[in-house]
Amino acid sequence: MDRVRPLAGGRNVRIREAVLNIDPYVPGKSKEEIAREYGIEPDEIVKLGSNENPLGPSPKAVKAAKRELERLHEYPEPLAPPSLYEAIIDYLADPPYPAGEPVEITREHLVVGGDGADEIIDVLTRVLVDPGDPVVIPVPTFSQYGISARACGAEVRKPRFDPERGFELDEDSLFEALDREVRLVYLCTPNNPTGNRIRERVVRDVVEECRGVVLIDHAYVEFADHDYTPLALEYDNVLVLRTCSKALGLAGARVGYGIANPELIEHLHRIKPVFSLTRPSAAAAEATFRDRDYIEKSVRLMIESRKYLYRELRKLDRLTPFPSEANYLLVDVSNTGMNASEFTEELLKRGVIVRDCSSFEGIEPFYVRVSTGTLEEDRKFIEVVKDVLEV
């Protein structure tokens, strides 16, 4: 039943119960926010909290975006420019990252989102889910799945990534949650925030058993040792979700894309907002997809950073980092005598931002997520952690 809430003007406005029961997304903290709160110059802050590309955007992307500023008075393409579709198609046909699996697709296999991958998550959920429909979201994972599902009034079933087994996905709880009524399964691999993969056999078993759609979120696939993108062509009930926010360095441009069978894509386009992809963002994305040297350099840097951080954090007795296939590490801080909130607060006082994972559903309040950085940023982070731990 919906509740009635009085607004400032004295009117009673009906707010849907499903909306009132949603916990809002908790984003990572920005440099500007920390600068205001702690009186630290933004240039002195090390931000390792939002899984961004520490190299910054491709210079070619910046140049391309600037060219489009002269046309801000004109609407962009309703969905995406044809040249951007072609750039994505070429990128997927010859992927410039270690585990990339080539796929041959057409424009009809693609949906491009102008609010990053979040837009596609939201549109896919609204296309498939009616109030009361069951969906499956293993936890802990990316919070946007639950927000979109609950906004549609879904019944959310929550199998778990098991912390006792290094956050491996618990197959028993996963398949107990699946039945013929499930409309949508959200699988993030590598998983955010844990960094580990979901094994291909498990993914295939879910896809073959599920009568609904399986969303495979590959936001971090450029850093991984696996690539399940070809499953979008092998199965008609799979959508593989990708983003330009991580390896491609365009988190601020908000560009995501999905690969699926053309019939499903057609249904997404029925309700996907038109003109949501701005001219500068589309131009920046196209230029980045074409800049293979930049992508290869970015991926190499972040994988090297991940290895360095894992190695150095393992040397500190009171911290437990988990192996990762993404551009971040999950770290257990329970042996420090602090919870995640207290630990991150100590880092913030010293000008270092990491992600307190307490807001993730299904995880104890003793985990932080550390993004990869430049070697200079990584070294400062380790020094600050040692200071906090008084090592």
From Swiss-Prot:
Keywords: Amino-acid biosynthesis, Aminotransferase, Histidine biosynthesis, Pyridoxal phosphate, Transferase
Family per similarity comment: Belongs to the class-II pyridoxal-phosphate-dependent aminotransferase family. Histidinol-phosphate aminotransferase subfamily.
HAMAP family assigned to the protein according to its UniProt record, in alphabetical order: HisC_aminotrans_2 (MF_01023)
Catalysed reaction equations from the record: L-histidinol phosphate + 2-oxoglutarate = 3-(imidazol-4-yl)-2-oxopropyl phosphate + L-glutamate
N6-(pyridoxal phosphate)lysine sites (modified residues): 246
EC number(s) recorded for this UniProt protein: 2.6.1.9
Membrane-traversing stretches: none
GO biological process, one term: L-histidine biosynthetic process
InterPro entries in alphabetical order: Aminotransferase_I/II_large, HisP_aminotrans, PyrdxlP-dep_Trfase, PyrdxlP-dep_Trfase_major, PyrdxlP-dep_Trfase_small
Gene Ontology terms, MF aspect: histidinol-phosphate transaminase activity; pyridoxal phosphate binding
PANTHER family, alphabetized: HISTIDINOL-PHOSPHATE AMINOTRANSFERASE, HISTIDINOL-PHOSPHATE AMINOTRANSFERASE-RELATED
Xref: SUPFAM superfamilies: PLP-dependent transferases
UniProt key word Glycoprotein: no
Required co-factors: pyridoxal 5'-phosphate
Signal sequence annotation: none
Pathway: Amino-acid biosynthesis; L-histidine biosynthesis; L-histidine from 5-phospho-alpha-D-ribose 1-diphosphate: step 7/9
Protein name in UniProt: Histidinol-phosphate aminotransferase
Gene that encodes it: hisC
